Amino acid sequence: MWVSSPDPSDIQARVKALTEARGVPMLGENDVPPLLADAVVATEDERFYSHHGIDSIGLSRALLYDVTNLCLCQGGSTITAQLAKDVYLGGSDRGYNKVKDMALALKIERVLTKRQILADYLSEITTGYGHYGVTEAACVYFHAPLGSLTLGQYALLAGVTQAPSIYDPTVNPDAARQRRSQVLAQMVAEHYITAAQRDKANAEPVVAAGPGC
């Protein structure tokens, strides 16, 4: 079913309903720690602050890869498109819905700030086995408030969100450490942190406290 044009109250109400149903907090645009925002943008959507919902460069690159490899391997999706897919389309990855989530992403970008889009996305994403949102992830993995984590912990969270079943530090600490290193390297490449900060964060142990807060 096609979705009508979203407006701020519509999408905010939907995200609120999702987070309330899952028992996790909904982040406001000022609640996302800057280092976490930098880590997520650097690794998931490097042109997030310059595109309008669709990253034409990333989409073209993904299309070329898929055509060359005869597969639907790369989606070229943006953070905004992912939010649209999760909130309006139930997270479906079917090709038919990719057109819808891109169209919705363009509309969402007209009515929400970049900071609120990122906050909504980080409020509702899957972050582990039955866990949702980065606030719960910080509690589950580190037994700490979201705003009090280290650079290494933020990088680990950013890595977990892309593939929770693979990078969950309570299940695969070695994979989580490797992914954290990749996130930190990308943050250096995008000029969010220095090489010295990267090295210090890479030296942090991957300490996962396990389920419960």
Question: What are these model-predicted stretches?
Answer:
Residues 1-213:
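Juxtamembrane regions of bacterial inner-membrane/periplasmic proteins
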